[in-house]
Amino acid sequence: YVINLSVKLAIVMLLFVINLRFMIPNGENTAIKSDLNILFVIDKSVSMKALDYNGSEERFEGVVNDSCSIVDELSGCKFSIITFGDEAQRVIPFTTDSDMVQAELKSIALEDDYYAGGSSMNLARDTLEKTLKEESKRQNGNAKFVVFFLSDGEITKEGETLETFSDIKQYVTNGAVLGYGTSTGGKMVSSLYTDTPDSPNYYINYYDDNYNRVTAISKLDEKNLKQI
């Protein structure tokens, strides 16, 4: 479901309390030594460019900010990242190197709207299931996985509907679906723009059935996020 930042942080602190093993002071910060595996599943599709986060910022700014906050709060756990759009891939294996994880989060590039083939959350589902199965086996079935799924819920791959995630829950100890965007939606700046915001080519656009140029608007899909 869609939740604001304060609730997101409350969830993080709940996980912190439930799964804390012991803590070791580490300079100014306190590191958590834990058997938790934190897995981010991050939407990097074109719609995450929509300018309706925190007023008029890019949705993906929210994703990066919240993910980095989670890494800070759960420093000492193991982290891994899956990204998805028109394809899905695991970009880093599980690691306790928080600095590397945050650097990777900040370096994720959104898809180019000129080449993008439509976003698919089913690809994310398949990659997530594969990762959880492999890591569970590698860690002899003793691993605890916390999954954070960060997306606007929008599926743009033609003819696709969301598949069930229910058969994955056997591998997941806890987690949250974090939603980004609004029901009214937002415009997306084109990766090909060369002009100013008042130019018709600045934002992603398309031609409707009557061959009229229309500015594309991406809207949050709460139904898909709630289903996950």
Describe the residue ranges of each PLM region.
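Second-shell loop/turn segments in exported
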Residues: 48-60, 68-69, 86-91, 108-118, ...
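Acidic, polar low-complexity linker/tail segments
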Residues: 1-39, 45-53
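Von Willebrand factor
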Residues: 22-24, 89-143, 181-188
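Loop/turn elements at helix/coil->beta-strand transitions in domains of secreted/extracellular proteins
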Residues: 75-79, 143-144, 171-175
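…and closely analogous acidic/polar surface helices at protein-protein or active-site interfaces
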Residues: 28-36, 47-79, 95-96
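VWA/integrin I-like adhesion module and closely mimicked acidic/polar interface patches used
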Residues: 153-226
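DG-centered beta-turn motif at the end of beta-strands
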Residues: 15, 43-45, 81, 128, ...
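Extracytoplasmic/secreted envelope proteins and their assembly/folding machinery
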Residues: 60, 64-68, 98, 102, ...
